[in-house]
């Protein structure tokens, strides 16, 4: 090998390596999305990847869109975007009939050219309406206490805390968005002076349905 040929070989090697690095400089997030109840693959799920950046030595403090995609028929997705100084990252999966879910990602896991995997599972949505009705005249000191005991809610208005209804209230109705295809356990108490009568039961909330729970006291 002549001297000129040797240097040409070295130059081409460096150029090829540089180009290869340039090709692989992007961040890549991939994975699959399934139904959290049935484990079936979900297609047409909207995938949104967001990031917070460190720019000019300062922390931006807000999320910006890094990339987006839609899952295939097999539930898989792949998002690729330009690498940057990420300090926080998250991926969101959303689909009609399901509760939107956000996954926080490790910013340090992202390296240029590497493919990071993150699978998502979405819960089907359901709604429940609770009707608490007083059927007759009750003593002034009587009170109805009601609560769910194991519900997973997707609205700020609902939780598993007690709801207390006094005898001055004729009826009370409220509705909550919950994780579907599950049995919700509940308990209610009718509190009279010197006596408390309670009942425990459950109601099934099927996906994409409104379940109605009527309690009379």
Describe the residue ranges of each PLM region.
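A short, solvent-exposed loop/turn motif at the edges and junctions
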Residues: 82-112, 189-198
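Short Pro-Gly-centered beta-turn/loop motif in secreted/extracellular proteins
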Residues: 73-89, 163-187
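A short, amphipathic beta-strand motif
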Residues: 29-35, 75, 126-135
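Extracellular beta-sheet/turn segments enriched in Thr/Pro/Gly and aliphatic residues
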Residues: 106-125, 129, 196-217
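Compositionally biased low-complexity segments at domain edges in trafficked proteins
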Residues: 122-151, 215-217
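Short, acidic Ser/Thr/Gly-rich low-complexity loop/linker segments typical of extracellular
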Residues: 55-76, 154-170
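Bacterial Sec-dependent N-terminal signal peptides
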Residues: 1-40
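Short, ordered, surface-exposed loop/turn motifs in non-cytosolic proteins
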Residues: 38-59, 136-156
């Amino acid at each position: 090998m002549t001297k000129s040929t040797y240097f040409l070989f070295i130059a081409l090697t460096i150029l090829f390596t540089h180009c290869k690095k340039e090709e692989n400089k992007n961040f890549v997030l991939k994975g699959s999305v399934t139904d959290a109840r049935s484990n079936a693959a979900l297609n047409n799920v909207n995938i949104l990847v967001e990031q917070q950046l460190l720019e000019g030595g300062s922390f931006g403090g807000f999320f910006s869109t890094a990339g987006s995609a839609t899952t295939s028929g097999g539930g898989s997705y792949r998002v690729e975007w330009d690498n940057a100084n990420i300090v926080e990252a998250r991926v969101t999966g959303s689909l009609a009939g399901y509760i939107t879910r956000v996954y926080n990602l490790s910013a340090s896991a992202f390296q240029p050219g590497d493919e990071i995997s993150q699978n998502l599972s979405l819960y089907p949505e359901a709604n429940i309406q609770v009707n608490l009705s007083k059927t007759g005249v009750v003593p002034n000191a009587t009170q109805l206490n009601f609560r769910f005991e194991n519900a997973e809610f997707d609205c700020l208005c609902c939780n598993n805390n007690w709801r207390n209804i006094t005898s001055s209230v004729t009826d009370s109705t409220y509705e909550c968005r919950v994780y579907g295809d599950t049995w919700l356990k509940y308990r209610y108490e009718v509190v009279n002076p010197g006596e408390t009568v309670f009942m425990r039961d459950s109601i099934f909330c099927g996906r994409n349905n409104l379940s109605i729970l009527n309690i009379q006291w």
